[in-house]
């Protein structure tokens, strides 16, 4: 298989974890910000997580530099465009990007400006390249909840025209879903699709709760259903897709090594698995890398790869017309 040429779908990719290091330097110059260094190798080292981190929280420290520069409309539009450009250039045909709008208000940007900027960057890339995309609004579980409704209302102006879904992300504690039930309900009332980060840090119960309490149609990671039979059966029975991110799952210690990743066992048992990058820069990866790692580690055939590709298409938060277009690459 030529992994670069294969059509690819990425349903789980974070904007602030996928910024080009050179762009950090460029934007810092434009914004008169002082970086710890102007050496791109030093900047890259600060943005890329080690191959294995002690835990997820250590991995999340790599988002500090992007957060510093992602505070203007111009920066957000550029970073959005470049991410879709990078994906298109390795034959990613459809990309869903998630980001936390509340993280980009340090300099007073309005929620409307934030949403407009990322969608504008994406649409510019869609016009220039053979790629389609959408945005997912991520709320960090640790942030105050009083702004969540405002985020959802601002995003609703672009609903199904660049923004499609609601997500909860960040450090994961057991039982977090209970306190977010009203917000997930409100998101659904507005017309958002639901995907929730859960089961990345040891709590299979969180996956069960994400589906049963929050109405998750997809789950970010979901690794720890392997030791929670009720969550496992719910995912399987409800055909909830898992957004697995192999390199990231190894880095954050969700699994000890790629060979121990449950993606193939899940797949063979009929669970809807997908292959995704999570954070292209922080995990120093591409979709080409992720596909190669999974295909080679688990000896997948080309037919099995295209089956997983089709699972990704069927679970994408996009229109039937776009899905038909994406399925044409698998024929």
Curated annotation (Swiss-Prot):
Binds 1 zinc ion per subunit. GO terms for cellular component: cytosol. Zn(2+) binds at residues 12, 14, 197, 278. Substrate binds at residues 14, 16, 170. It catalyses: adenosine + H2O + H(+) = inosine + NH4(+); 2'-deoxyadenosine + H2O + H(+) = 2'-deoxyinosine + NH4(+). GO terms for biological process: adenosine catabolic process; hypoxanthine salvage; inosine biosynthetic process; nucleotide metabolic process; purine ribonucleoside monophosphate biosynthetic process. It is an enzyme of class 3 (hydrolase). Its EC number is 3.5.4.4. Catalyzes the hydrolytic deamination of adenosine and 2-deoxyadenosine. Belongs to the metallo-dependent hydrolases superfamily. Adenosine and AMP deaminases family. Adenosine deaminase subfamily. This is Adenosine deaminase. The lineage of its organism: Bacteria, Pseudomonadati, Pseudomonadota, Gammaproteobacteria, Vibrionales. The gene is add.
């Amino acid at each position: 298989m030529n992994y670069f040429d294969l059509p690819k779908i990425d349903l789980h990719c974070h904007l602030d974890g996928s910024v080009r290091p050179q762009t950090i330097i460029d934007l810092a110059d434009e914004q008169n910000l002082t970086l710890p260094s102007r050496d791109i190798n030093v900047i890259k080292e600060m943005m890329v997580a080690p191959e294995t981190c002690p835990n997820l929280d250590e991995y999340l420290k790599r988002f500090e530099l992007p957060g510093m520069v992602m505070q203007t409309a111009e920066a957000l539009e550029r970073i959005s465009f470049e991410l879709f450009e990078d994906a298109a250039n390795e034959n990613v045909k459809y990309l869903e990007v998630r980001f936390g709008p509340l993280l980009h208000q340090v300099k007073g940007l309005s929620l409307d400006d934030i949403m407009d900027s990322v969608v504008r960057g994406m649409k510019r890339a869609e016009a220039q390249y053979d790629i389609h995309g959408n945005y997912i609004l991520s709320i960090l579980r640790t942030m105050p909840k009083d702004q969540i409704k405002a985020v959802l209302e601002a995003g609703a102006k672009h609903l199904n025209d660049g923004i499609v879904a609601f997500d909860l992300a960040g450090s994961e504690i057991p039982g977090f879903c209970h306190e977010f039930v009203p917000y997930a309900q409100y998101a659904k009332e507005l017309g958002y699709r639901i995907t929730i980060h859960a089961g990345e840090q040891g709590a299979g119960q969180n996956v069960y709760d994400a589906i049963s309490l929050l109405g998750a149609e997809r789950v970010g990671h979901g690794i720890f259903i392997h030791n929670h039979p009720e969550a496992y059966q719910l995912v399987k029975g409800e055909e909830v897709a898992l957004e697995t991110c192999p390199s990231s799952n190894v880095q954050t210690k969700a699994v000890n090594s790629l060979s121990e990743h449950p993606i193939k066992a899940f797949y063979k048992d009929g669970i809807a698995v997908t292959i995704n990058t999570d954070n292209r820069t922080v995990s120093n990866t591409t979709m080409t890398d992720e596909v190669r790692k999974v295909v080679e580690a688990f000896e997948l055939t080309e037919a099995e790869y295209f089956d997983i590709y089709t699972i990704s298409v069927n679970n994408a938060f996009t229109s039937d017309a776009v899905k038909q277009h994406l399925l044409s690459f698998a024929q």
